């Protein structure tokens, strides 16, 4: 365990596959995200994931674009969200609060089965490339919680792009071409994209656009439904 924790702290690409199975002593059992035969060395593995596990690609606080994994556990409780791995930065913490507050206000528009009063949620955030945490975590956090609460596995090989404000306004993707390139390098085959970014696709090389199934959303609720494969 100590070796794994040290490798995680060192970060960097050469150690990312250690994270396919790891233990968080505070809250988690051992988690297996994928097996090497499935993942083929990609950050976003092929094959079915599990409820509450999602991947997002966005810009870190250092300005670099990276891939981040969220893993969620739900348990009986009184409506508390605990986030591990986000570090001490203000933006990531605010984004996770935005997601939970949005869910409290609008959860019934997604599903009556999602409780923010009788369940607690624990989410572990992983900076897969060791470049620093991103602040764009509200939408991925919302999708991760809904996935865990509904017991629905997200679409496989999916990268979540874009962000939402506390009021649900869509925030388009910065540097779309570079972000999609990181999605491709990370192993994504499907990309969830805000409709507000559609106009920027003209700036992206056509072969890069053609590398994915692009899935557009126009509201936060629609993003949740489409990420979970619910029509």
Language model features with spans:
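C-terminal helical "lid" of AAA+/P-loop NTPase domains
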Residues: 1-8
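Flexible coil/linker segments and helix-coil junctions enriched in charged and small residues
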Residues: 10-13
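Peripheral, non-AAA+ core regions of ATP-driven protein-machinery
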Residues: 15-31, 35-231
């Amino acid at each position: 365990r100590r070796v794994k924790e040290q490798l995680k702290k060192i970060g960097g690409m050469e150690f990312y596959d250690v994270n396919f199975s790891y233990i968080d002593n505070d809250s988690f059992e051992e988690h297996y995200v994928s097996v090497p035969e499935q993942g083929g060395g990609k950050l976003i593995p092929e094959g079915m994931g599990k409820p509450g596990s999602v991947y997002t690609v966005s810009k870190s606080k250092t300005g670099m674009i990276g891939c981040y994994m969220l893993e969620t556990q739900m348990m009986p409780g009184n409506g508390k969200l605990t986030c591990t791995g986000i570090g001490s930065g203000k933006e990531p913490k605010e984004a996770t609060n935005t997601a939970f507050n949005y869910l409290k206000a609008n959860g019934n528009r997604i599903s009556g089965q999602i409780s923010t009063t009788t369940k607690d949620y624990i989410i572990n955030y992983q900076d897969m490339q060791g470049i620093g945490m991103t602040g764009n975590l509200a939408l991925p956090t919302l999708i991760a919680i809904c996935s865990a609460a509904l017991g629905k596995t997200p679409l496989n090989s999916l990268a979540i792009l874009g962000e939402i404000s506390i009021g649900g306004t869509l925030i388009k993707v910065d540097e779309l071409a570079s972000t999609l390139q990181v999605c491709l390098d990370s192993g994504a085959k499907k990309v969830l994209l805000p409709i507000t970014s559609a106009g920027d696709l003209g700036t992206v090389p056509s072969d890069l656009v053609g590398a994915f199934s692009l899935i557009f959303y126009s509201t936060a609720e629609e993003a949740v439904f489409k990420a979970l494969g619910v029509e």
